[in-house]
Amino acid sequence: MGLEISYSNGFVLDKNLEVKLNKAFEVISAEEDLSQYSINIRIVNDKEMMDLNRKFRKKDSSTNVLSFTNNDISKSMTGNLGDIAINHDFVKRESIEQGKTFDDHIIHMLIHGIYHIPVSYTHLRAHETRED
C-alpha cells in the first residue's frame, strides 16, 4: 500500500523528499510487517496544526506532528491505519534550531508519527529500546 500525501495552503514538498518519505515508510513497513497497510499524511501549517491540536488534544498551541489511529471498522477493508499531520512551519523552525536539514527532520517526524499509530509505540518504549 503506502503513503497518501496531501497538502494544505499550497505548500508542496519537493518530489525527492516525497520519495524519501515513501522509502522510510517502506523500511518501517518491512520491519513491522505493515506492507499491506496505508497511512494518510497531511502536510499542514501552524494554523491548521493549532486547530487540530485544539480540537483533538485540547491544547491551544501548535506542534510538529500528530497521529490519529483509524479505529473504524473500515480499517480491515481499506487497510488504512490512520492519519499523520506534519506541520511544515514547525518542522522548519525546529530543523534550524537543532541544526538538521529540513528533509531529515520531516522524515524523523514521519517515523515518529508512524510509531504512534500501528504498534502502540510510546516514548517509554523508545527509551527502553535505546538502552537495549
Tell me what each language-model feature is.
Residues 1-106, 115-125, 130:
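An acidic/histidine-cluster motif and surrounding catalytic segment
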Residues 112:
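Nucleotide phosphate-binding/pyrophosphate-handling subdomain across enzymes
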